């Protein structure tokens, strides 16, 4: 059985993960989603700390990692926001970062909430 995913999470990405574990015997999707949740907590804290210290290279590192991991689980808006921040930091366009970082903070909450029913759903 498959729950209808939230529009926050791309179904095709989830299906690619499911396809790697036919029948769900290895609980791959659940494990990947739990690992994502754990990394989000760590990366979110790093992002808050880097932002408070105005450490743009640490911001860039955190969003780079978050960009890839969020894309892998289908959180495409979050991934795009992270890519936008990463590109801005790369060219030192810092003026527009505060609202983008706020968007990432909000989207992290939305993504984590969307993952809860997916993480515990049967394969």
For the regions a protein language model found, what residue spans apply to each?
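Two-component system phosphorelay core
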Residues: 1-123
């Amino acid at each position: 059985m498959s729950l209808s995913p939230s529009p926050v999470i791309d179904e095709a990405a989830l299906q690619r993960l499911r396809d790697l574990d036919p029948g769900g015997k290895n609980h791959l999707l659940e494990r990947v989603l739990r690992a994502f949740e754990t990394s989000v907590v760590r990366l979110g804290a790093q992002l808050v700390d880097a932002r408070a210290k105005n450490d743009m290279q640490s911001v860039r590192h955190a969003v780079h990692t978050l960009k890839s991991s969020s894309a892998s689980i289908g959180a495409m808006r979050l991934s795009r926001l992270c890519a936008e921040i990463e590109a801005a930091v790369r060219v030192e366009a810092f003026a527009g970062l505060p609202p983008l970082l706020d968007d990432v903070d909000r989207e992290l909450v939305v993504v984590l909430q969307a993952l809860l029913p997916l993480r515990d759903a049967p394969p």
